[in-house]
């Protein structure tokens, strides 16, 4: 589910937020996402932001998906790690995008280890309804790969929320 189309003013706002470091825009964008997806959020146990590779996060200074997820007023779990930096998806077609992110994500080993240390309890994501959060959905390749990892780790259901959906996805 997306709150709007990735065009016009919304596209400009997301660009300013993501690439110009205008983190104050997380509040209105997160509010827009929260308002548009209240039914989905009411049925979830937690939200999981799509992770950035550590080098990209260092360069940008923040993870835009995490900033958005914080504003959804639901428990947030950093359940995923991005293992490898992937080339930018911008110029890739749908098939290349899926290949580009294949194997790029794993469930956080800390999450699994913490569960084992506490009497073998299941990881927090097991048997839960999870909402993945990202800024823009284009082909869905990144969200699909993240969902695949969460489901393999035992999530009951994974839904995806984005602020905007690019025309290629509609």
Regions found by a protein language model. Give the residues of each.
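Conserved PRPP/pyrophosphate-binding segment of the phosphoribosyltransferase/PRPP-pathway fold
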Residues: 1-133, 139-170
């Amino acid at each position: 589910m997306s709150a709007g189309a990735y065009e016009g003013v919304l596209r400009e706002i997301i660009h300013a937020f993501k690439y110009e470091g205008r983190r104050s825009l997380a509040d209105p964008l997160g509010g827009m996402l929260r308002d548009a997806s209240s039914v989905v959020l009411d049925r979830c146990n937690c939200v999981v932001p799509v992770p950035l590779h550590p080098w990209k996060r260092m360069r940008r200074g923040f993870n835009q998906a995490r900033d958005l997820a914080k504003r959804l007023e639901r428990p947030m779990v950093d359940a995923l790690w991005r293992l490898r930096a992937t080339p930018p998806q911008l110029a890739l077609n749908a098939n290349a995008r899926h290949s580009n992110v294949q194997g790029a994500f794993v469930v956080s080993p800390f999450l699994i280890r913490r569960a084992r240390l506490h009497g073998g309890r299941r990881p927090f994501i097991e048997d839960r309804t999870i909402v993945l959060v990202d800024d823009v959905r284009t082909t869905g390749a990144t969200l699909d790969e993240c969902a695949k990892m969460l489901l393999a780790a035992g999530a009951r259901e994974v839904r995806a929320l984005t602020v905007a959906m690019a025309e290629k996805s509609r």
